[in-house]
UniProtKB/Swiss-Prot annotation:
GO biological process, one term: translation
The protein's name: Large ribosomal subunit protein bL17
Organism, scientific name: Bifidobacterium longum (strain NCC 2705)
Gene behind the chain: rplQ
Low complexity biased stretches: 150-164
Pfam families noted in UniProt: Ribosomal_L17
Family: Belongs to the bacterial ribosomal protein bL17 family.
Self-association and partners: Part of the 50S ribosomal subunit. Contacts protein L32.
MF GO annotations: structural constituent of ribosome
Highest classification ranks of the organism: Bacteria, Bacillati, Actinomycetota, Actinomycetes, Bifidobacteriales
Keywords: Ribonucleoprotein, Ribosomal protein
One of the record's GO cellular component terms: cytosolic large ribosomal subunit
Length: 177
């Protein structure tokens, strides 16, 4: 039996695992959220995000790639029309996993995996970043000017001290004579 690419095997065979993940992805896209065990949710997340990325492309080849995994045409239609439009501004992170109380029957760690449908507040973040960059640029010349003055001032003081030092040595030499 080949070793799995990521994490422990969730089912008895690779084919069963692929089918189980495909069924969970179908349910996720139909309902928007599903409750499952934490390991299954963690294994479903990369598959669901990859399928949403294909849906955002929207071309025929991407639709056929999604149809390899999700066999239900109505769910594929929902994915390409509704979900892809909701995720248009989002650059990844299409799903969210929330841990919940352990399952009652066997105390397995349970989780809810859901689609993130909140709009991205990207423009406000960009404006704040630009404002911070402007402030940093304005402060940078002031800091450089202070650093230049600080470097020049000790040079003048040491030059004055060197000029005084020979005079003091000469005075000491005269006293010694």
């Amino acid at each position: 039996m080949p070793t799995p690419k990521k994490g422990p095997r969730l089912a008895s065979s690779p084919a069963h695992e692929r089918l189980m993940l495909a069924n969970m992805a179908t349910s996720l896209f139909q309902n928007g959220r599903i409750t499952t065990t934490l390991p299954k949710a963690k294994r479903l997340r990369p598959l669901a995000e990859r399928l949403i990325t294909f849906a955002k492309r929207g071309d025929l080849h991407s639709r056929r790639r999604v149809m390899r995994v999700i066999r239900n045409k109505s769910v594929v239609h929902i994915l390409f029309t509704q979900i892809a439009e909701q995720m248009e501004q989002r650059e990844g992170g299409y799903t969210r996993i929330v841990k919940i109380a352990p399952r009652v029957g066997d105390a397995a760690p349970a989780a809810v995996i859901e689609l993130v449908t909140e709009p991205v507040a990207k423009k406000a973040v960009v404006k704040e970043a630009e404002a911070a960059a402007k402030v940093a640029e304005e402060e940078a010349p002031a800091v450089e000017a202070e650093a230049t003055e600080a470097v020049e001032a000790p040079v003048e003081e040491t030059a004055a001290a060197e000029a005084e030092a020979p005079a003091e040595e000469a005075a000491d030499a005269e006293k010694a004579e």
